[in-house]
């Protein structure tokens, strides 16, 4: 928390020429920078986990059961929630759960497959590569937006620290 003290000191020096700026307002500015960094990093972590789940779905998109009675891989879906963080007095993004998609499996006629039932049908995962690809692009763009936001917050912190010199 020495970082917060330094930022508060810099803001105090920076705003010392402005009589109408209070210490509380300076503290809010320092806390806002910390909150921005925490919000961005939580978003990056959440999107990173989302990309991991998507990549697992893609990697297992053709994994069938070994026998007719065994189900194939089931697509996983990640869910998020905003969680209050009292340290920064705001909400951050967290993974609330990862659940299996309960939609139907794809059936293909492959009578010679070891997992074929008595009709020759094989159950394939309920993974749609197009959906996973679109989701991964969205997750990557959201991750990149959080990186940009984090870089801006760090740049602002560095500018404040430069003012102390």
Model-predicted regions and their roles:
Residues 1-2:
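N-terminal secretory signal peptides that target proteins for export/translocation
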Residues 5-19:
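Bacterial N-terminal signal peptides
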Residues 18-165:
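Amphipathic alpha-helical polymerization modules
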């Amino acid at each position: 928390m020495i970082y917060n003290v330094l930022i508060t000191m810099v803001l105090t020096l920076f705003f010392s020429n402005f009589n109408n700026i209070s210490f509380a307002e300076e503290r809010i500015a320092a806390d806002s920078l910390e909150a921005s960094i925490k919000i961005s990093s939580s978003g990056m972590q959440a999107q990173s986990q989302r990309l991991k789940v998507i990549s697992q779905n893609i990697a297992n998109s053709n994994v069938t059961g070994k026998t007719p009675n065994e189900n194939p891989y089931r697509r996983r879906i990640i869910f998020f929630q905003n969680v209050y963080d009292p340290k920064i007095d705001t909400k951050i993004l967290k993974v609330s759960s990862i659940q299996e998609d309960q939609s139907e499996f794809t059936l293909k006629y492959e009578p010679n497959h070891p997992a074929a039932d008595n009709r020759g049908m094989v159950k394939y995962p309920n993974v749609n590569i197009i959906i996973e690809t679109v989701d991964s692009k969205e997750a990557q763009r959201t991750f990149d937006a959080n990186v940009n936001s984090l870089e801006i917050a760090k740049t602002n912190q560095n500018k404040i620290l430069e003012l102390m010199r």
